Amino acid sequence: MNNFGKYNGNLNLIGPIIREKRKEKGMSLETLSNQLLFLDVNIPITSLHRIENNQRTVRDYEICAIAVVLKIDVQDLLNPIVEKFKKL
């Protein structure tokens, strides 16, 4: 199996954090997908599901747009990952 571009078999580390923040806001994948369209960022529900399950990479502009829609700071999504690496 090719693990190029993966970390511990995952294509991203931010997906579960996105899911957690989305659920905290009581937002469905469908609502998130629809709200992203207002920012000209097209991430279908199936792709959001794959992101949240570490099965799809996430582009920098997608992370920023997701943070805007969730009304959180980008650092709220990134800090848990930074802290994980600090502990290594």
Predicted regions and their residues:
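Flexible coil/turn residues that form the inter-helical turn or adjacent wing/linker of helix-turn-helix
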Residues: 14, 25, 41, 56-59
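Helix-turn-helix DNA-binding elements, focusing on the entry/boundary residues of the two helices
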Residues: 18, 29, 45, 60-63
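A short, Lys/Arg-rich alpha-helix, primarily the initiator
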Residues: 1-25
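Residues in the recognition helix of alpha-helical DNA-binding motifs
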Residues: 21, 35, 51, 80
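Short alpha-helical DNA-recognition segment
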Residues: 26-50
